[in-house]
From Swiss-Prot:
Molecular function terms from GO: formate C-acetyltransferase activity
Function: Acts as a radical domain for damaged PFL and possibly other radical proteins.
One GO cellular component term noted in the UniProt record for this chain: cytosol
A Pfam family reported for this protein in Swiss-Prot or TrEMBL: Gly_radical
Domain (Glycine radical) ranges: 5-125
Origin: domain of life: Bacteria
PANTHER family: FORMATE ACETYLTRANSFERASE, FORMATE ACETYLTRANSFERASE 1
Name of the featured protein: Autonomous glycyl radical cofactor
Native source organism of the sequence: Aliivibrio fischeri (strain ATCC 700601 / ES114) (Vibrio fischeri)
Key words, A-Z: Organic radical
KW Ligase (keyword) present: no
Length: 125
């Protein structure tokens, strides 16, 4: 388990007010920030911190889920895309986001255009 601490009192003055992530499973300490003596991201054995007093620091740990979420934001009206399918000559510069890439709507196949419309506009969340 990883916990965050700020050292408030220590025999080693370099540790004073430094912030650390303690990994109890590996018995390691990772420096988040220190004014002297330690570098950010430096990993040492937890025992090297010596005796100290500390306060807990809230930490946020990023989820380790593969895949995650992806959001493409297109700010436009459904009618605009539907009209672009019917009259592509009126929308030569219409650009949308698809899978993280900017693409001209007219360069997509009709099937892809309809898929974009279906996925972009929903009745409710």
């Amino acid at each position: 388990m990883i916990t965050g601490i700020q050292i408030t009192k220590a025999a080693n003055d370099d540790l004073l007010n430094s912030i650390w992530l303690l990994d109890s499973e590996k018995n390691e300490a990772r420096c988040v920030v220190a004014t002297a003596g330690f570098e950010a991201d430096q990993v040492i054995a937890a025992s090297e911190l010596g005796e100290y007093e500390s306060r807990d620091v809230a930490i946020e740990k990023a989820p380790k889920i593969e895949g995650g979420q992806h959001l493409n934001v297109n700010v436009l009206q459904r009618d605009t895309l539907e009209d672009a399918v019917k009259h592509p000559e009126n929308y030569p510069q219409l650009t949308i986001r698809v899978s993280g890439y900017a693409v001209r709507f007219n360069s997509l196949t009709t099937e892809q255009q309809k898929d974009v419309i279906a996925r972009t506009f929903t009745e409710s969340l």
